[in-house]
Amino acid sequence: MLEQTLDHLQALVSFDTRNPPRAITTGGIFDYLRDNLPGFNVEVIDHGAGAVSLYAVRGTPKYLFNVHLDTVPDSPHWSADPHVMRRLDDRVVGLGVCDIKGAAAALVAAANASDGDAAFLFSSDEEANDPRCIAAFLARGLPYEAVLVAEPTMSEAVLAHRGISSVLMQFAG
């Protein structure tokens, strides 16, 4: 499955999803994901101001995987085109491979390697600290037991990360 993941990663890196300038549309990377998630019910939503999300569901999953697709702006100090993934020995280089197109590629490869229930929310508004995609998703009130957010955390599970949170609490007494 590594080669399939790297193939998807190469494609995902080729899409310019820098944020700013928030020029992401419902095409491009979202067309690629839609085309590579066969068997999923896919919904692409434009939330305005360059914030786009793709919600994909197959079956009746208990968990949702969330991945943002936007990247930080590139730098003039890149030694090669940042939108062309390069393999260097045991690593790959390209804009967004770590944060976090690599996780998106792995999820797409895993989804294609099985026919199990799965749910994904791909968003494009994380880098600008304008959580339109997540806020709109939370407003839908979909009943997942947990959401797993893909972020580079040095392979450590974390229970909180910068961003927004949503809590539903009940008190008695």
Describe the residue ranges of each PLM region.
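N-terminal helical capping/dimerization or prosegment-like subdomains
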Residues: M1-S75
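A short, structural micro-pattern
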Residues: L6, S79, H161-G163
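Alpha-helix C-terminal capping segments
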Residues: I29-G39, Y55-G59, A80, A106-D115, ...
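A generic structural signal for beta-strand entry/edge sites
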Residues: A51-S53, D89-V92, I164
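Short beta-strand-to-loop capping motifs
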Residues: R58, F171-G173
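Active-site metal-coordination/substrate-binding segment of hydrolases
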Residues: L64-F122
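Acidic/histidine-rich catalytic neighborhood of metal-dependent amide-processing enzymes
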Residues: G96, I100-F171
